[in-house]
Amino acid sequence: ERTVISNLRPFTLYRIDIHSCNHEAEKLGCSASNFVFARTMPAEGADDIPGPVTWEPRPENSIFLKWPEPENPNGLILMYEIKYGSQVEDQRECVSRQEYRKYGGAKLNRLNPGNYTARIQATSLSGNGSWTEPVFFYVQAKTTYENFIHLIIALPVAVLLIVGGLVIMLYVFHRKRNNSRLGNGVMLFELMRMCWQYNPKMRPSFLEIISSIKDEMEPGFREVSFYYSEENKPPEPEELDLEPENMESVPLDPSASSSSLPLPDRHSGHKAENGPGPGVLVLRASFDERQPYAHMNGGRKNER
């Protein structure tokens, strides 16, 4: 036995169930089914796009292509392939069926101004369909007004970027310069501390320190004089330490006072040990007769 089933979709998989029945089928029913899977043959031209391809201009150097789907394709349409170009159709773009059903076509972006041609081909489970007739479209160049608008927008942005870059460079430069100055100061402090601690004879004077760091000073700071200060003033001559009750016996002439003083006798040592007696004038040593002492810079504090 054989039969022909018509009006099936091309290149489609079907399951066919067969039951045997007789005149008692209404009472007893038919036999158990026996099934078979079979795929129909592909139809020629079923995957071809039936209608013409149209296009619509879009901004930003792009266009939108539209085309109808095959009415009865071989199985299932998988994707569409677009082949386009300006002089030679050397560029290709694939569009899935889901994307086509969402937008109703495809958008071509980043096109240069000029004339183009495009053709479209559908791909199904059976294979590729035929290419459509070429569609011609063109992309217009941007007008001068649009270029001017873009220039107005881009110019302030570029200026801001340049100014921001300069500010960042100056900040980094000054920060690096300040860090280097701080490092030099720390190194100089450590060197001076070691000299002061381990070798007092090699302690530099204040002027030597200034001379060693004068290259690191600001131009205005170099003009400040360090040769005179309150600390470098010569000491004031010390006054005589006299008791108020003995002020009348002190002569005004230093030579007269030295000649009028009595010479020490043999008991002077005894008196010196027990302290000066009443009526004896005690004069302190002058500044020149004092014992000099060492200054931190290597000189003498009371030298003139």
Swiss-Prot record:
Source species, domain of life: Eukaryota
SUPFAM superfamilies: Fibronectin type III, Protein kinase-like (PK-like)
Phosphoserine found at: 225, 229
InterPro entries, alphabetized: Ephrin_rcpt_TKs (IPR050449), FN3_dom (IPR003961), FN3_sf (IPR036116), Ig-like_fold (IPR013783), Kinase-like_dom_sf (IPR011009)
Ranges of compositional bias, category Acidic residues: 237-246
Glycan attachment sites: 115, 128
Membrane topology: Single-pass type I membrane protein
SMART domains hit by this protein: FN3
Leader sequence residues: none
Disulfide pattern: none
Chief location: membrane
A Pfam entry, by short name: fn3
Localization (cell): Cell membrane
Chain spans, region Disordered: 231-304
Catalytic EC class: transferase
Residue span(s) of domain Fibronectin type-III: 1-43, 49-142
Residues that span the membrane, as ranges: 148-168
CC annotations in GO: plasma membrane
Function: Receptor tyrosine kinase which mediates actions of insulin-like growth factor 1 (IGF1). Binds IGF1 with high affinity and IGF2 and insulin (INS) with a lower affinity. The activated IGF1R is involved in cell growth and survival control. IGF1R is crucial for tumor transformation and survival of malignant cell. Ligand binding activates the receptor kinase, leading to receptor autophosphorylation, and tyrosines phosphorylation of multiple substrates, that function as signaling adapter proteins including, the insulin-receptor substrates (IRS1/2), Shc and 14-3-3 proteins.
Subunit note: Tetramer of 2 alpha and 2 beta chains linked by disulfide bonds. The alpha chains contribute to the formation of the ligand-binding domain, while the beta chain carries the kinase domain. Forms a hybrid receptor with INSR, the hybrid is a tetramer consisting of 1 alpha chain and 1 beta chain of INSR and 1 alpha chain and 1 beta chain of IGF1R. Interacts with ARRB1 and ARRB2. Interacts with GRB10. Interacts with RACK1. Interacts with SOCS1, SOCS2 and SOCS3. Interacts with 14-3-3 proteins. Interacts with NMD2. Interacts with MAP3K5. Interacts with STAT3.
The name this protein goes by in its record: Insulin-like growth factor 1 receptor
Species this chain originates from: Sus scrofa
The gene coding this protein: IGF1R
